[in-house]
Amino acid sequence: MSKRVLIIAVVVYLVFTTQNQITGNHTTINSSSPSTTEASSTPTVSRTPQTTTTSTAVSTTITATTTPTASWTTQSQYFNKTTQHHWREETMISRNPTVLDRQSRASSVRELLNTKFLMLLGFIPKGEVNHLENACNREGKNCTELILKERIARFFSETEKESCYNTYLEKHLRSVSPEVSLTPYRVLGLREDILLKEIDRRIIRFETDSQRVTCLSASLLKPDVFIREQRIDAKPSNGPKIVPVDSVACMNLEANVDVRSNKLVIQSLMTTVKISLKNCKVVVNSRQCIHQQTGSGVIKVPKFEKQQGGTWSSYIAGVYTATIDLLDENNQNCKLFTECIVKGRELVKGQSELKSFNIEVLLPRVMKTRRKLLAVTDGSTECNSGTQLIEGKSIEVHKQDIGGPGKKLTICNGTSVLDVPLDEGHGCYTINVITSKRACRPKNSKLQCSIDKELKPCDSGKCLSISQKGAGHIKVSRGKTILITECKEHCQIPVPTGKGDIMVDCSGGRQHYLEVNIVDIHCPNTKFLGGIMLYFCRMSSRPTVALLLGIWIGCGYILTCIFSFLLYHLILFFANCIKQCRKKGERLGEICVKCEQQTVNLMDQELHDLNCNFNLCPYCCNRMSDEGMSRHVGKCPKRLERLNEIELYLTTSECLCLSVCYQLLISVGIFLKRTTWLVVLLVLLGLAISPVQGAPTEVSNVKQDGDYSICYFIFGCLVTAALLLKVKRTNSNGIVVVVDSFGRCPYCNEFTDSLFEEVLHDTLCSLCVCPFCEKQALDLVTLEEHVKECYKVATRKDIFKILGRKFTNALVRREKLFTTGLQLFINKTNVVVFALIMCFLLLLTGHNASAFDSGDLPDGVWEESSQLVKSCTQFCYIEEDVCYCPAEDGVGRKLLFFNGLQNSVKRLSDSHKLLTSVSIDAPWGRINVESTWKPTLAASNIAMSWSSTDIKGEKVILSGRSTSIIKLKEKTGVMWKLVGSGLASEKKKPFRFPIMDFAQVYNSVFQYITGDRLLSEWPKAVCTGDCPHRCGCQTSTCMAKECHTQECVSTHMVLGIGTGCTCCGMDVERPFNKYLGVKWSTEYLRTEVLVCVEVTEEERHCEIVEAGTRFNIGPITITISDPQNIGSKLPESLMTVQEIDDSNFVDIMHVGNVISADNSCRLQSCTHGSAVTTRFTALTALIKDDHSSGLNLAVLDPKVNSSWLSWEGCDMDYYCNVGDWPTCTYTGVVTQKLREFLKLDQHRKRLHTTLSFSLKKNLSKRSHTSVRLEGKTVTRMEVKVTALIEVDGMELHSKTIRLSGIRLTGLKCSGCFSCTSGISCSVNAKLTSPDEFTLHLRSTSPNVVVAETSIIARKGPSATTSRFKVFSVRDTKKICFEVVEREYCKDCTPDELTTCTGVELEPTKDILLEHRGTIVQHQNDTCKSKIDCWSNSISSFASGIGDFFKHYIGSIAVGVLGTVLPFALLILFFIYGDKMLWPFKVFCRPCRRCCRKNEGYNKLAEEEELRDIIRKFSKSGELINKDAKDKRTLARLFMSDNPKLKKEKKLSEIA
């Protein structure tokens, strides 16, 4: 009885205790700390239907403070508490099976089992797990410690791919799918699909209340990381106690801080050397297992025991990677202690002993702001894009069958270290250290960058100041200039050169679209000449020509004189050079026998021969004795002068061309100078006042379209000449002989070739007789069928041509009438007439057409534009420049905030930036502003023609249609002026059709990744047996060669010679260094166009056009065709290229360049010497060696080894080293492709020169990558669309309307001058009659212009407030506006039609604006006729001159007198010269005497002297005169005092 009572009491006690424990267990699970964010973040649901638990653990979290000196008492208490709980639960289940179901019992068994497994793996201290075997027996399982050891060994050793395991680590086939007892969870580094596929099969989670470890089986991941456990026995030595993390130089530790992601990555190369943590949270990746460890204690790594040959051996993970998040609060006081292993003395060559000393690794500390790190030079920032690749270190265990490039480190028996690889046979293991890439995983995926609107001064001038959270690349592009810069939280980037808006791509993918605030008024030299240049711009459409005209009037003749002087001496210089060159080949003159003097040249010798024989001096012509001749000639005072004359003559006569030019300058030089000045003056004047061929609308850096009217005229003349070849003129009686052209018979529809044949057809065919065979037909239908099949057509046609030519010529000669022949020609040559008409029309069209271009092609934000168009629908209403739409959830949001015109009132509705356009007609010229106000407009005005006009009361009802072909460029468009007929009062009602943007959309297919890869080789040798397969290559890109006999004495450890094998391998060590390229194949899909239709500010609609769209706004309907003439497209193959800086930081999203890849090698078809010999078909291949981001199963991805490398023409060999492993050599191998890849980037066609890309992003998702390309053509072959506008029943006010009571009040203006944002004005307008009228304003100042906007004035007690834009080119203190329609308000006073206000305009700031509105340009109206064009240009020129005189002189009359009178006197002086001094000679006798005196003693000009010298010689250059009767008289020709030379003046100095 007592036994039963005792048993019942025990059972009741156990039941009560177990229920409390279960409740506490559930509470513990639900309240588990979510601190394991690195390992898990996905909520999990337990199998219990009524209990929902959140599992936040992914990896083992060791929360207990465990140190190597932990007492056994603490461990015993821990195990007793755990086993007691499970034993009580087990007892309760055995006595009362209905308390928990089978799942609860299985969960209890699993917790006991996991505790045992973690003990055997070394993650928790060893101890007894009570009642585990009994619990397993009830489930039919064997859970003895020996069995569990064997299962763990098999789990980490057996590499059969089909081996799977359950929670008891029992092996089963993959086809058997056991029930997954736990819901899937996230594991750092593992994809969800792999986890769902392998959980509880080849991925096992060992989990207890406080620890979680996830391990991979050997069947899933090859267990190369496990090595025989070796205790490191290093000799103690002295060393530093505290070492900064960036100064650690230990053999057992590789530690580095990634400043871009705030991660401290610790690579342990000797896992038996303990690393102790204090107050840390670390994620440990030991390749086969991953766990998280929190608190203090030694970093745990998996190890197990394996029975081999009857003995148990301990295996441990040879390497592991520990990652510490420096921004985690749990790591604020983290400390790291370890034993630093370094090399000691060298035992033998290549082998050294180990020494050690204890150190504390000083970690970077995070400030409270969590923005900067102490003890880090650069500062630590978080990476902010998942497309970034960060460089780091990776370590692997290399066993005998594994090889690859990298730095090798071999540890033998825990006592020595070698630099060569050795395997377990020598008691060693080898660690390989390589450089790897890891992908950034930002915590915040919505990081953005902010841009300071004011430009900052920097070394390169002006820079953009950009701030962002984290580190990454920022791309700034402007036109064809692209800058990619690495930015860490804050950076300054120079403003790109060129024209156009600025696109900024942040690291996270956010795009900013900026414009420069400085307005370009297209009035040149305003910075230097100020307001004066504005008057020249108002005078002429060619202000530079007008400025040159003024300069030419004042300084033109001086310039012509200077040019003539330079030309004169330049010709003389070239003549001298030619003479000197020819003189070297000529012989000198001989010695004169008579005077005994050496003659200079042949002409001098001839002069001596003609004079010395008569005892005459050849230079002064004086007669003397023979003795006197020899004494006098050499010292004659005239000798040098005569020799200079001869030299000058020879100089000017050597080259005929130069001689002609020289004589021409001398004879007509003054006339040429005056004529040149006058002609240039007239040309400049004509150009200044001539009308322009439509104002050019291109930005200055874009090549403009020229005037093709001359080309059209020449083409028309050629066509006409070709058709007029049939008209031949002869001299027979002066008659024009006409050769007939083609005609057609109206009866038989047969073509006729002559007048004779036509008359024959008219005569016979009317009688139903065939003109060829003369057969009778029943009717005309039968005749027509017969003529088509008549067999005599060909022969009779030839006869008719001959007869027709004779008949026509005879007819014309007989009639003697040219008119008759001309009429025949006109009647019979309709083709020629049509051609002449077409040529004439082309000529007129070429003169009056206007371009629709509106500037350069800056990059567009296509996504924002598309969203904007889709958001602002017809259900929204428009106020000012904001589109308000009903909110879906009653919450307001604003896209593309528009500061300048944004209403400050917050509305509970969606608002979008309005798609407006401002058109400007500036009196100083056209305006061109690089803006982001989409769409800006080049208002090319087209007048509408009306097909019907009806009058109903004071209304005019108009209907009509028009068509326009528009060049497809973003931020451009066309504007129709709906000009009313003569009955309408409105002069114009603009109808705008702006094109916001357009893009060519492509479909892309990824081909491969390539780069300027770096190759590296490694040797491999074994003492006995065969070499490993492919020398241990683990990839498909390596090359290997082996020699089956080991002929080298490798080391002192190899005992035999010729008993082993040697091999060499070579593989890619770094896939890229300076260049990363991705090849794509593209397919053109479509061209999307964002267009808008705008009648007024209240009537606007936008749409994306693909296959034609129709808009309806009131009475106006517009139809748009498909895009046409799409000439420039992307090639079928292209390559995106990224240049990598010295930091080796890569962001695959920011593409720097796009080049054509049509001629590049295709997959597996290149030689080793080409640039793209290395191909990786998946991005996973770039990060396959990374272990700092969690478990890496990239090696299991088949795409990783689908890479390819060409080894054609390459070979490898080796040579022996005494006492060392052999050295590998190679031939034909290019180790790095930097030079080849650089040539590829430079020589291939760069596509951004022909297409402007609005989006160039490489995107990656898992192992797949894609590119988003949206571009537009920038070549001359531009895309076009056709727009058809139809107006049906548009109402305008008639001219009979009378306005009254117009009031303009409350004018307010504010803004800046010479800036893109301009001046914003508001005014209140009302009237008394009619009920509503559209008014327009214009400025009274020429420096201020008003946008072409309408002011709505309505009848009522309160005025209507209207807002409009104003632009000022200069600072002004007062702005006045007047009503354009003032002529319709007869009763209004000038004060009522004019309104003014004082303003304080801000100066232009050097800032950048984002999403702000402004103008691009406005094209001037075309004129109706040439006379009208010229009259308008002349009046504009005159008015500009008048404004200039008023402003700077004060009066037009004074300005005219002060300018025209000197100009007229200057012209008269040029025409009459010194003859204008005749009145002074008559009335002033002293002046007359002075003039006579000067005339007598005037020296000859240099030109006249040369004319006299040349006159003394004949054309052949001989010293002979036809009038000379004696040879002695020849000498007198050179005598200046000869009385026979009449009035020849004395020669001056000879040039």
Swiss-Prot record:
Sequence segments annotated as region (Disordered): 24-66
Disulfide bridges in this chain: 1023-1216
Annotated organism of origin: Dugbe virus (isolate ArD44313) (DUGV)
Record's compositionally biased regions (Low complexity): 31-66
Membrane-traversing stretches: 547-567, 676-696, 705-725, 824-844, 1452-1472
Protein name: Envelopment polyprotein
One Pfam entry name: Nairovirus_Gn
Site (Cleavage) residue list: 105-106, 374-375, 662-663, 694-695, 849-850, 896-897
InterPro entries: Gc_C_bunya (IPR048791), Gn_nairovirus (IPR048801), GP38_nairovirus (IPR048529), Hanta_Gc_N (IPR002532), NSm_dom_nairovirus (IPR048796)
Record topology, Cytoplasmic segments: 568-675, 726-823, 1473-1551
Keywords for the protein's UniProt record, in alphabetical order: Clathrin-mediated endocytosis of virus by host, Cleavage on pair of basic residues, Disulfide bond, Fusion of virus membrane with host endosomal membrane, Fusion of virus membrane with host membrane, Glycoprotein, Host endoplasmic reticulum, Host Golgi apparatus, Host membrane, Host-virus interaction, Membrane, Signal, Transmembrane, Transmembrane helix, Viral attachment to host cell, Viral envelope protein, Viral penetration into host cytoplasm, Virion, Virus endocytosis by host, Virus entry into host cell
All ranges on the Lumenal side of the membrane: 18-546, 697-704, 845-1451
Sequence similarity: Belongs to the nairovirus envelope glycoprotein family.
Site positions per UniProt: Involved in fusion with the host membrane: 924, 1221, 1336
Residues with glycosylation annotation: 25, 30, 80, 142, 413, 848, 1201, 1258, 1420
GO annotations of cellular component type: host cell endoplasmic reticulum membrane; host cell Golgi membrane; membrane; viral envelope; virion membrane
GO biological process assignments: clathrin-dependent endocytosis of virus by host cell; fusion of virus membrane with host endosome membrane; virion attachment to host cell
Signal peptide: 1-17
